[in-house]
Amino acid sequence: MDLKKPENKGALTSKIAELANNISTFLKNILGSDQHKAALLYYWLRNYLRYIKQEETFNPKYFPQFKPGDIVKVDFGFGIGSGIGSEFGGLHYAIVLAPSNSKNSTVTVVPLRSLKLGKESPKTLYKSDVYLGTELFTVLLDRSGEMLDKCGTFIKEVENTDPKTITVKDIARFEKQLEEAKNLLARHDIIMKEVSRLNAGTVAIVSQIRTVSKIRIQNPRYSKDALYNMRVDRQATDKIRAVMKDLYNIK
C-alpha cells in the first residue's frame, strides 16, 4: 500500500497513531534498563521533529559564512551501533572542512571528541582518528581571555571618566558597552564550561566526516554566539586532510 496516495489517507492516519504508540512503548521499556539511551533517543526524536518544522522557514543566508577550520557545535543525531565503525551521534564540536557561503544550506564537517584519559593515548588511537592535542582547548581559552580583556577596557573607560564632564552621549555609549559586556560575559561562561572538558586533548574522527544541514548547527548561528569566527590553525586541518587522503586512497 502506497501511503502517499490521497485515497490511503485514512490508513496513513492509523499507521501514524500506531507508530506513535510503538515509540512511546519502546522508550518506556528501555527507560528502566538504560535511561541514558532513552534520553538520547528522546532528544533525537524531539530535535528531528523541530528541524522538520524549521525547514519551512529555514534560510541559510542568516547563518555565518563558514570557512575551513571554523569550530562549530553540531547535533549529529542518534548514533546507531557501538564500537569501531558505528555511527557517531549526539551534540559535539566539529571542524568545518570546506567553505560554505550564505547560499549553501549544508556544511561539511569532521566531528571531534575528547581524548579518554586512562583508556587511550595519542599513540593508541585508530588510524582514522587524528589527535589534535590541546588545539581546541587553546583556541577557546584564548577567546575567553579576549572577552575578559574587552570587558576590562569598558570598565576602565567608565572609571577614568570625570563625572563632572560626562555627557548624555557618554551615558548612551556606556549603556551600549554595558550591554555588550553582559553578552561577552555570558559567552565567556559558556566557553569556560566547555574548556574544563577539553584539557586532555581533542580527537578528530575522520571516518565520520559528513555533510550536514546548517539547521543542525547549534553554535554559532549568529555573530554574537560564543563560537562565532573561532577557528583552529592551518596545521590542524592539514593533519586531518593527510589522514583523509591515506584513509580513502586519495592521490
What are these regions (language model features)?
Residues 79-91:
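Short, Lys/Arg- and Gly-enriched loop/turn segments at beta-strand edges
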Residues 89-99:
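Short beta-strand-centered aromatic/proline hotspots
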Residues 99-105, 116, 211:
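Short, conserved beta-turn/loop elements at beta-strand boundaries and strand-helix junctions
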